[in-house]
């Protein structure tokens, strides 16, 4: 099992699909990486040589922000908004939708499970 960017990549899958197991690399970036390195898209991970795995690893480290670094940057951006006290930061702080969605009836994913109101019956 190849290990790239701290993630164990499944060996039976095609390289393009297997790279999407890394946080921060989707199908588009995976295709770009494979084209840059020059590996055929239909090749499977267990068919890769050590040199090819090393090339993929270097391409990801050089050109993309993945896994822990990406998560840390995202968390720092949210923390910055919260520290500024801007509208988006307040919405993050209160656990409400940030991008203008309605909250009167929906937004259960962001707000959590519904809270029962005492004395309210049908």
UniProtKB/Swiss-Prot annotation:
Keyword Electron transport in record: no
Region spans: Disordered: 99-122
This protein's UniProt keywords: Ribonucleoprotein, Ribosomal protein, RNA-binding, rRNA-binding, tRNA-binding
Gene Ontology cellular-component terms listed: cytosol; small ribosomal subunit
Any GO BP annotation: translation
GO MF entries: rRNA binding; structural constituent of ribosome; tRNA binding
Stored InterPro entries: Rbsml_uS13_C, Ribosomal_uS13, Ribosomal_uS13-like_H2TH, Ribosomal_uS13_bac-type, Ribosomal_uS13_CS
Record flagged with keyword Nucleotide-binding: no
Family: Belongs to the universal ribosomal protein uS13 family.
Function comment: Located at the top of the head of the 30S subunit, it contacts several helices of the 16S rRNA. In the 70S ribosome it contacts the 23S rRNA (bridge B1a) and protein L5 of the 50S subunit (bridge B1b), connecting the 2 subunits; these bridges are implicated in subunit movement. Contacts the tRNAs in the A and P-sites.
Subunit composition and interactions: Part of the 30S ribosomal subunit. Forms a loose heterodimer with protein S19. Forms two bridges to the 50S subunit in the 70S ribosome.
Protein name from the UniProt record: Small ribosomal subunit protein uS13
Organism: Rhizobium leguminosarum bv. trifolii (strain WSM2304)
Gene name in the database record: rpsM
């Amino acid at each position: 099992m190849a290990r790239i960017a701290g993630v164990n990549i499944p060996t039976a899958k095609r390289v393009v699909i297997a790279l999407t197991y890394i946080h921060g690399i989707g199908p588009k970036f995976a295709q770009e990486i494979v084209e840059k390195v020059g590996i055929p898209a239909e090749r499977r991970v267990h068919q890769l040589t050590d040199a090819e795995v090393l090339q993929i690893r270097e391409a990801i480290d050089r050109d993309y922000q993945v896994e822990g670094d990406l998560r840390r940057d995202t968390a720092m951006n949210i923390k910055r908004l919260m520290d500024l006290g801007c509208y988006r930061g307040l919405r993050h702080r209160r656990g409400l939708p940030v991008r203008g969605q309605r909250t009167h009836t929906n937004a259960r994913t962001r707000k959590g499970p519904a809270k029962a109101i005492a004395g309210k019956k049908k």
